Amino acid sequence: MDRIVEIEKVSFENDFEVSLRPSKFEDYIGQEKIKQNLDVFIKAAKKRNECLDHVLFYGPPGLGKTTLAHIIANEMGVSIKMTAAPMIEKSGDLAAILTNLQEGDVLFIDEIHRLSPAIEEVLYPAMEDFRLDIIIGSGPAAQTIKIDLPKFTLIGATTRAGMISAPLRDRFGMDFRLQFYTSSELSRIVQIASAKLGKECDKNASLEIAKRSRATPRIALRLLKRIRDFAEVNDEQIISHERAKEGLNALGVNSLGFDEMDIRYLEILMQARRRPMGLSTIAAALSEDEGTVEDVIEPYLLANGFIERTAKGRIASAKCFETFNVKIDIEKGLFE
């Protein structure tokens, strides 16, 4: 099922998103603490004429990990090479990428938690000593050839930091968890994006879109593009608050940013009446894979207190029952 609030796991953006990407920290909205720290570390590295230490970004999808990687490369004055872990199937694939880097380049690996152990073994000496250890042959006759690499900065991005092996994580000089955005931050992002689309957006309209965007910029931009369609069909140059609400309601995104899938998820938990449910059970009931449930649906619900994770599974919170005006002990149904 396609969702207007869905976020693709592989975060290589389309042309529209690329056109909106800021190139400097001062133009990047949100993630203030991360920006401040990175700005210091980059200035220090440039002052010493060194590469920036390897960086790990983690957190829910759509929060700006790829954008920050591009800003780092731009601020360092170097090129960025991009790939994703699923594309690196053999050690030779990684070796080809590493040997084609130039001095100081940034290598961005998305979904880095999906690297195989064999690939990680090749990556360790590259990260620590900027060296490739190539094993030729097998058994007692095997030989190791060492190839020097140019110094580079690896930036890893993941939605599942817990799946990154400890040895790999330890080799990053810094790691940052990206936080959800405030409605005010998202409203500013929507205003900037709408101007680039050649469409003025009323302040209340941009705030309405922001409030229904699950605190995620990528979703806010996706909703904005669809609301623009509603305005254009009605020959309106300005996106009004009423038009924004009409469009969002038509898209099935409610005032909390929930769509049909979120409601189904919460219904399943509320029907359990505070009995914990396992991830596999929930995923089966939704006809979704466990990764999508855990990485895409749950983070926003958890962050806003609608669900709780216990040692035995997931439960709907008291806030969830109150929001939907559901009593835990009712027998006839959920939404009466």
From Swiss-Prot:
It holds the Pfam family RuvB_C. It catalyses: ATP + H2O = ADP + phosphate + H(+). One of its GO terms (biological process) is DNA repair. It comes from the Bacteria. GO terms for cellular component: cytoplasm; Holliday junction resolvase complex. It is an enzyme of class 3 (hydrolase). Its main location: cytoplasm. DNA binds at R309, R314. Residues 255-336 are annotated as: Head domain (RuvB-H). Its EC number is 3.6.4.-. Transmembrane segments: none annotated. Keywords: ATP-binding, Cytoplasm, DNA damage, DNA recombination, DNA repair, DNA-binding, Hydrolase, Nucleotide-binding. Residues 1-181 are annotated as: Large ATPase domain (RuvB-L). ATP binds at L20, R21, G62, K65, T66, T67, E128, D129, F130, R171, Y181, R218. The RuvA-RuvB-RuvC complex processes Holliday junction (HJ) DNA during genetic recombination and DNA repair, while the RuvA-RuvB complex plays an important role in the rescue of blocked DNA replication forks via replication fork reversal (RFR). RuvA specifically binds to HJ cruciform DNA, conferring on it an open structure. The RuvB hexamer acts as an ATP-dependent pump, pulling dsDNA into and through the RuvAB complex. RuvB forms 2 homohexamers on either side of HJ DNA bound by 1 or 2 RuvA tetramers; 4 subunits per hexamer contact DNA at a time. Belongs to the RuvB family. Homohexamer. Forms an RuvA(8)-RuvB(12)-Holliday junction (HJ) complex. HJ DNA is sandwiched between 2 RuvA tetramers; dsDNA enters through RuvA and exits via RuvB. An RuvB hexamer assembles on each DNA strand where it exits the tetramer. Each RuvB hexamer is contacted by two RuvA subunits (via domain III) on 2 adjacent RuvB subunits; this complex drives branch migration. In the full resolvosome a probable DNA-RuvA(4)-RuvB(12)-RuvC(2) complex forms which resolves the HJ. Has 3 domains, the large (RuvB-L) and small ATPase (RuvB-S) domains and the C-terminal head (RuvB-H) domain. The head domain binds DNA, while the ATPase domains jointly bind ATP, ADP or are empty depending on the state of the subunit in the translocation cycle. During a single DNA translocation step the structure of each domain remains the same, but their relative positions change. This is Holliday junction branch migration complex subunit RuvB. It comes from Campylobacter concisus (strain 13826). The gene is ruvB.
